[in-house]
């Protein structure tokens, strides 16, 4: 038997029906149109939470990527600065080597060897580090952003490492590299010429790997300077080679002018050496030769001793000539007694001619008088001082003139010439002006003289060689090199222009 459901209105009373209608009307009146049912609230709450979590995750990911991009940019800038500084320092080393070669006269630097292989970091773009974010989607997005960043901004280090064939990714302190460097160093030592001394003759040779790798061969430096070119993003080569950019004509001009003060091979100035006298055979035929024993009279100075003609010992304007034989100490020097401190030159070589007042000035004759001048009971010291005149003693005796006149080449007429008693202090002071060690205030150095010559309006009409020879005659030696007075430079310039 089937059950048939009955309607509620069939069994409810009329009063109950009125109450249910009122409740239905009240419920419809309180609810608003469009409001979702209550059973959907838990689902919407979960959706809002998921959206907030995704938003926070994206913000954290963007913040992390921005920090990584800033770090990459800083590292790229530091790498570019380091490479630029390396190229600049290498160019400076080449310039200093060339300058050193000019002064030393050779380009052999056997004890300055560096390794030809320098180990450094590999290509930074070959190894990308993916940021792990906890989800596969996040890791893929972060790696893609890093790849896009590297594609947009290529690193300059990659271009340098790709275009620099002089570098290799090898450890400079490896065993193979050390053996190669030792072999190269031995070959360089065999190629060193015997006449050229090393820069550091007493340098200690260490066998540690660090010191071995701090040695630089000239071939390795030249190879690095010529082969290493920094290539930027636009592939513009900037070769920092300043080898032939200095001293176009200043170097030969100054080298020729520096001959006035001597060079490395000839320390004595050339123009004074060429004007020096021929080899002189010095004998002992002086007026004082009778004081020497016959054994020493047979000795004559050989003509092959060239230091007698050296301008350093026998200058044109100097007062000191060393025309004595110092090679053989066993043979007595005929004029050695003149070097004795107890020997009075003024009394020995004074004027022997008697004066009118000699009888009064003779101390021996005064002893025979009735009233002796040396009587201890009387104070006659004033009489003695008044009788002896200062002219009786030759105070202006010049020992150098006496030695010059005593030599055979000075005695052409066979007679002894008395030494000159004129005062030579003024001449000596004038000649000493040419040997001033500190530079005078109004002088010009070689580079300043060359600047003044090249800035002259008639520079093309000047005879540079002739002007240089004239400047050498006016040159002075100082701690700064050759210097010439400004007035002399201007005078010689005007004279050369008139010619």
Swiss-Prot record:
Disruption phenotype: Causes hypersensitivity to cadmium, 4-nitroquinoline N-oxide, 1,10-phenanthroline, and hydrogen peroxide. Abolishes the peroxide-mediated induction of COR33, TSA1, and many other genes involved in oxidative stress response. Inhibits trehalose accumulation upon exposure to oxidative stress. Shows significantly reduced viability when exposed to whole blood or polymorphonuclear cells, as well as to the Chinese herbal medicine baicalein. Also leads to decreased virulence in a Caenorhabditis elegans model. Increases apoptosis upon apoptotic stimulation. Transcription activator involved in multidrug resistance, oxidative stress response, and redox homeostasis. Preferentially binds to promoters with the core binding site 5'-TTA[CG]TAA-3'. Involved in the oxidative stress response in via multiple pathways, including the cellular antioxidant defense system, carbohydrate metabolism and energy metabolism, protein degradation, ATP-dependent RNA helicase, and resistance pathways. It comes from the Eukaryota. Induction: Induced by oxidative stress and during contact with neutrophils. Expression is also up-regulated by the thioredoxin TRX1 and by treatment with Chinese herbal medicine baicalein. SUPFAM superfamilies: Leucine zipper domain, YAP1 redox domain. Residues 40-103 form the bZIP domain. The keyword Phosphoprotein applies. Residues 68-75 are annotated as: Leucine-zipper. GO terms for cellular component: cytoplasm; nucleus; RNA polymerase II transcription regulator complex. The keyword Transcription applies. Residues 43-66 are annotated as: Basic motif. This is AP-1-like transcription factor CAP1. Residues 1-64, 104-215, 408-442 are annotated as: Disordered. Keywords: Coiled coil, Cytoplasm, Disulfide bond, DNA-binding, Nucleus, Oxidation, Phosphoprotein, Stress response, Transcription, Transcription regulation, Virulence. Residues 49-105 form a coiled coil. GO terms for molecular function: DNA-binding transcription activator activity, RNA polymerase II-specific; DNA-binding transcription factor activity; transcription cis-regulatory region binding. Contains two cysteine rich domains (CRD), referred to as the N- and C-terminal CRD's, n-CRD (Cys-254 and Cys-261) and c-CRD (Cys-446, Cys-468 and Cys-477), respectively. A nuclear export signal is embedded in the c-CRD, with which the nuclear export protein CRM1/exportin 1 interacts only in the absence of disulfide bonds (or otherwise oxidized cysteines) within the c-CRD or between the c-CRD and the n-CRD. Upon oxidative stress, is oxidated by the peroxidase GPX3 and stabilized by YBP1. Oxidative stress induces conformational changes through oxidation of cysteine residues, masking the nuclear export signal, thus abolishing nuclear export by CRM1/exportin 1. Phosphorylated in response to H(2)O(2).
């Amino acid at each position: 038997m089937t059950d048939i459901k009955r309607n509620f209105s069939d069994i409810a009373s009329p009063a109950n029906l009125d109450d249910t209608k009122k409740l239905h009307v009240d419920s419809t009146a309180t609810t608003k149109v469009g409001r979702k049912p209550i059973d959907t609230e838990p689902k919407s709450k979960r959706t809002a939470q998921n959206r907030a979590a995704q938003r926070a995750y994206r913000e954290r990911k963007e913040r992390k990527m921005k920090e990584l991009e800033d770090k990459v940019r800083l590292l790229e800038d530091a790498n570019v600065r380091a490479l630029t500084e390396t190229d600049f320092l290498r160019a400076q080393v080449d310039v200093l080597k060339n300058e050193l070669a000019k002064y030393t006269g050779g380009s052999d630097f056997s004890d300055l060897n560096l390794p030809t292989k320098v180990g450094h970091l590999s290509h930074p773009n070959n190894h990308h580090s993916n940021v792990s974010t906890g989800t596969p989607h996040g890791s893929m997005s972060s790696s893609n952003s890093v790849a896009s960043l590297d594609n947009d901004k290529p690193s300059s280090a990659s271009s340098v490492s790709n275009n620099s064939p002089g570098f290799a990714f090898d450890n400079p302190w490896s065993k193979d590299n050390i053996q190669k460097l030792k072999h190269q160093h031995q070959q360089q030592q065999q190629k060193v010429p015997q006449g050229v001394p090393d820069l550091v003759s007493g340098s200690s040779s260490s066998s540690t790997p660090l010191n071995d790798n701090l040695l630089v061969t000239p071939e390795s430096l030249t190879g690095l300077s010529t082969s290493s070119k920094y290539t930027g993003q636009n592939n513009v080569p900037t070769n920092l080679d300043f080898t032939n950019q200095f001293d176009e004509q200043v170097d030969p001009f100054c080298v020729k002018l520096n001959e006035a003060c001597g060079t490395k091979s000839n320390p004595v100035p050339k123009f004074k050496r060429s004007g020096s006298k021929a080899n002189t055979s010095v004998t002992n035929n002086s007026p004082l030769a009778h004081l020497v024993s016959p054994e020493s009279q047979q000795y004559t100075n050989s003509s092959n001793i060239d230091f007698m003609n050296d301008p350093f010992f026998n200058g044109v304007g100097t007062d000191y000539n060393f025309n004595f034989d110092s090679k053989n100490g066993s043979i007595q020097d005929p004029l050695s007694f003149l070097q004795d401190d107890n020997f009075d030159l003024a009394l020995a070589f004074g004027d022997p001619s008697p004066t009118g007042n000699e009888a009064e000035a003779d101390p021996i004759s005064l002893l025979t008088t009735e009233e002796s001048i040396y009587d201890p009971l009387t104070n006659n010291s004033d009489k003695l001082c008044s009788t002896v005149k200062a002219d009786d003693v030759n105070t202006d005796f010049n020992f150098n003139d006496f030695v010059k006149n005593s030599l055979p080449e000075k005695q052409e007429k066979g007679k002894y010439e008395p030494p000159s008693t004129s005062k030579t202090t003024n001449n000596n002071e004038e000649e000493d002006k040419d040997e001033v060690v500190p530079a005078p205030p109004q002088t010009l150095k070689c580079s300043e003289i060359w600047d003044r010559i090249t800035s002259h309006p008639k520079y093309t009409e000047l005879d540079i060689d002739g002007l240089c020879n004239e400047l050498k005659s006016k040159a002075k030696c100082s701690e700064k090199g050759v210097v010439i007075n400004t007035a002399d430079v201007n005078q010689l310039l005007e004279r050369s222009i008139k010619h």
